[in-house]
């Protein structure tokens, strides 16, 4: 598994964010029963930068906590069975890893939302990575039923690494 973590802003957590990010990604892939070695890119940025990206890709002129850019188009969430036969271009030509996608997190939002929701920055960052990983695996939350499924899966992933509320 390859996880690229890029820090575009100063990061001052009281925990090792790289260890946490890798732990959450591994827990999510395990929970979703991904049979492949994967490549995932994570960018830690600030509100200003994520606002620009949000405006460019979603036409929303405001900062957000996390953005997900999936590389794989699933028929059904986490339906890895059809990936190899239908989307061979999603595999890195050299490593053979499934290029799942990119996650962009606003560190500013991690701090403000942790305070707002009354939990630790570690829990907030873990939640945002778990949430984004589910998007990379084809989940969405446009409908109430989809939202409930995502919430349950997020909880289960965070429970696996003892990061519940």
Curated annotation (Swiss-Prot):
Q: Which cofactor does it need?
A: Zn(2+)
- Report any one BP term from Gene Ontology: rRNA processing
A GO molecular-function descriptor: RNA endonuclease activity
Q: Point out the coiled-coil segments of this chain.
A: none
Q: Mind telling me which GO cellular component terms the entry cites? A: cytoplasm
Q: Where in the cell is it found?
A: Cytoplasm
EC annotation from Swiss-Prot or TrEMBL:
3.1.-.-
Could you tell me which SUPFAM superfamilies the record lists for this protein? Metalloproteases ('zincins'), catalytic domain
Co-factor note (free text): Binds 1 zinc ion.
Keywords of this entry: Cytoplasm, Endonuclease, Hydrolase, Metal-binding, Nuclease, Ribosome biogenesis, rRNA processing, Zinc
Give the transmembrane ranges: none
Gene3D superfamilies given in the database record: Metalloproteases ('zincins'), catalytic domain (3.40.390.30)
Predominant cellular place of this UniProt entry's protein: cytoplasm
Question: Where along the chain is Zn(2+) bound?
Answer: 131, 135, 141
Function (record text) = Single strand-specific metallo-endoribonuclease involved in late-stage 70S ribosome quality control and in maturation of the 3' terminus of the 16S rRNA.
Q: Which HAMAP family match?
A: Endoribonucl_YbeY
Regarding protein family, the annotation reads: Belongs to the endoribonuclease YbeY family.
Report the protein name in the record. Answer: Endoribonuclease YbeY
The gene is ybeY
């Amino acid at each position: 598994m390859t996880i690229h973590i890029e820090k575009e802003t100063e990061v001052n957590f009281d925990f090792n964010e790289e260890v946490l990010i890798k732990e959450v990604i591994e827990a999510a892939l395990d929970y979703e029963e991904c049979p492949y070695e994967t490549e995932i890119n994570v960018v830690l940025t600030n509100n200003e930068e994520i606002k620009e990206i949000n405006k460019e890709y979603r036409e929303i002129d405001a900062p957000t906590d996390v953005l997900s850019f999936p590389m794989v188009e699933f028929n059904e969430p986490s339906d890895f069975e059809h990936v190899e036969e239908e989307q061979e271009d999603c595999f890195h030509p050299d490593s053979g890893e499934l290029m799942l996608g990119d996650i962009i997190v606003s560190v500013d939002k991690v701090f403000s939302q942790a305070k707002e929701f009354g939990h630790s920055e570690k829990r907030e960052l873990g939640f945002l990575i778990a949430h984004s990983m589910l998007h990379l695996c084809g989940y969405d939350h446009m409908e109430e039923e989809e939202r409930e499924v995502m919430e349950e899966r997020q909880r289960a992933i965070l429970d696996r690494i003892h990061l519940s509320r």
